[in-house]
Amino acid sequence: SAASDVYKRQGAWGELEVSSDEHLNLHMAATCLHYGQEAFEGLKAFRGKDGKVRIFRLEENAARLQSTCQGILMAELPTERFKEAILKVVKLNERFIPPYDTGASLYIRPLLIGTSAQVGVHPANEYMFVVFVTPVGPYFKGGFSTNPYVIIREYDRAAPHGTGIYKVGGNY
């Protein structure tokens, strides 16, 4: 599956690049490897009954990625660039989107990582935004059914001023 890459160097985001390479070339001192300078999202593209492809919560995922970036002092990817990359990768991989009646979808993984080679705890100077996709089966294998769970809205799993509210690898 094709991936799209966008790099931020010298304070500006570069042009969208498309690649079929499944490997990233990183410096061993990249901040994503040592200081947690990484953020990701997860979206799905579904094929509708009418054959049209729909992407679930595109705008909301762009906003959440930006919120995560603010929270861990990473460069924020503009919403339009996020959407452009997602739409491009989905279009290039449309043939892998499962048929409507299967309950399956095309999983979309946007990933933003700090790539500067630096030692010391401070934000990266360079970033790479990558999007890759893979077909996945239904999330709920047995279909949708009710469960006897309680939702408690007053509880926060995150430590005060911690990173628990952000979509970063350290929380998984």
Question: Which residues does each PLM region occupy?
Answer:
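Helix-start/capping segments and mature chain N-termini
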Residues: 1-92, 111, 118-172
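Charged mid-protein connector segments
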Residues: 95, 99-100, 124
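Short helix-terminating capping/connector loops at secondary-structure junctions
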Residues: 99-103, 143-144
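Extended, Lys/Arg-enriched charged tracts that mediate electrostatic binding to polyanionic substrates
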Residues: 101-113
